[in-house]
Amino acid sequence: MVKVLFETAVGFCLFNVSDSSKLEATKNLHESLDSAEGASNLLKLSAIHRFTNTAEAVEDISAINEGKMSKSLKKFLTDEIVEGKGKEKENLIVAESKLASNIAKKLGIQVTYDSELLDLYRGIRENLATLLSSSSGDESLDPRDLNTMSLGLSHSLSRYKLKFSPDKVDTMVVQAIGLLDDLDKEINIYAMRVKEWYGWHFPEMGKIITDNLAYAKVIRAMGFRTNASATDFSEILPEEIEETLKAAAEISMGTEISETDLEHIWSLCDQVISITQYRTQLYQYLQNRMAAIAPNLTALVGDLVGARLISHAGSLMNLAKHPASTVQILGAEKALFRALKTKHDTPKYGLIYHSSLVGQAPQKLKGKMARMVATKAALSIRLDALADADTKSDEGAPTVGIEARAKLESRLRALEMQSGLSGMRSARNAAGDQGHKQKGFQMEAGGRSYNAAADAAGPSDMASAANMAPSMLPSTPAKPSTTTDEEKKLSKEERKALKKARKSEIAASEPATPAAASEAGDDKLSKEERKALKKAKKDANGVETPKKEKKDKKKRSADEADVNGTPKSEPGSSKKKKSKKD
């Protein structure tokens, strides 16, 4: 006997195949199951195991989809096949290969799986209502009830596959944080309007009361400022601020307003109070939602920052797909793309900057702290997004976030201590206190160094060398001056002429010094230097002697003429005589 196992929304069904020869002709099998009458002739309901509730149905159907045999299925097959009559002769057909191997292994019966028999299951599924309703006895079932149960089971099975939980709907968090930001803007606008409006009547009150809600409540309770002394503000303000407010109301410089103005101000104050109260309720709702959806992320960065991260990414699953580097700069996209465009430094943090761990860090450590918080936040987000809903509802669910926060706090204290020690060390270094640390070698200025300017000696250098005192002259012989590039290009005779001209200029520019001093200086000079000085003096004297001799001759001839009484010879006569002689 061949039997077919088929799972339905009602339960597990066993069908007897009346003609097993038709199963061998698989090509024509679909023709026998096209009509309800043909399906009823080929298959007969043998037994059915009804599900007691939806949870049992979801568990059993999920086990079959995974190729496993549930306890209820094992009991059903044991009662109907193993303990029944004709155990060795019966053959069971199933739709899953893994399920077939598990049943054959655990129950020891003959189980068949053939992919060519899929038309058989397709025909059973199409004519299931007819096959179940045609049965007699307790197994009869209304087709309408079957459709209802199939729909309910499909929804439950889909929810189980997706691990759906109403508390895990992050859309509520996205909408709540968006509404919270809008309410903050609206409260700020209305509160500023109230202060500007009522400030004409009581301008000093704006500096005394800074809280927007307390400001609106005081206006609602007091009305005109003249009623301040008779109004009790103990439920709204502290005692010190209340006394200051009453004292300022008596000497206020504000103008008077009418009853109509005050009524409109009161209505605006009512709006501020109601919106602020609703904002408080919404914040509590957001806290509860974040604790249910992302407990680890909330424990690490806080509910507001976590909700803004989820809202910016779109959903918790999308946020879990981001790496830690993206989580770190999430919310700073404009600054990031501007930095990439201008080739400047990229931002170090985005929305995560507003977390308490980054906020309490010093300015120098904010970037490093943001990177570490983003790393731990990425792990917490993935755990919150992919963990089961039952796991997160436990008391110890956010342990990963709490442990990560404790580690980051200890790490922050260690970094602050290191930065403090380095600051003290730099201060000691600036003050000159090096401690026991040995100083590194540094080249200090002030020692004797090589004078490159002494390599090329010009006219002024020679003159200064000649005028130097003997004690200031170097004890070592001077090196011969090197020729310049222009002198190298000249010929040997031209270079000699240039040297002579320079020496003559030096000798002409020398002041007359006493002979004793020059002789004493010459004694201290080296042999080569004395020769050079003598030669320069001779050249200078040789240039000046012809002119002096001519002047001396003219003076002597004039004196002789005066003594002898002969007339003075004209300058042109000598030239004429010379020309005649020539």
UniProtKB/Swiss-Prot annotation:
Keywords: Nucleus, Ribonucleoprotein, Ribosome biogenesis, rRNA processing. Residues 461-582 are annotated as: Disordered. SUPFAM superfamilies: Nop domain. GO terms for cellular component: box C/D methylation guide snoRNP complex; nucleolus; small-subunit processome. Gene3D superfamilies: 1.10.287.4070, Nop domain (1.10.246.90). It comes from the Eukaryota. Residues 507-519 have a biased composition (Low complexity). One of its GO terms (biological process) is snoRNA guided rRNA 2'-O-methylation. It is found in: Nucleus, Nucleolus. GO terms for molecular function: snoRNA binding; snRNA binding. Residues 485-496, 521-531, 538-549 have a biased composition (Basic and acidic residues). Residues 293-417 form the Nop domain. It holds the Pfam family Nop. Required for pre-18S rRNA processing. May bind microtubules. Belongs to the NOP5/NOP56 family. This is Nucleolar protein 58. The lineage of its organism: Eukaryota, Fungi, Dikarya, Basidiomycota, Ustilaginomycotina.
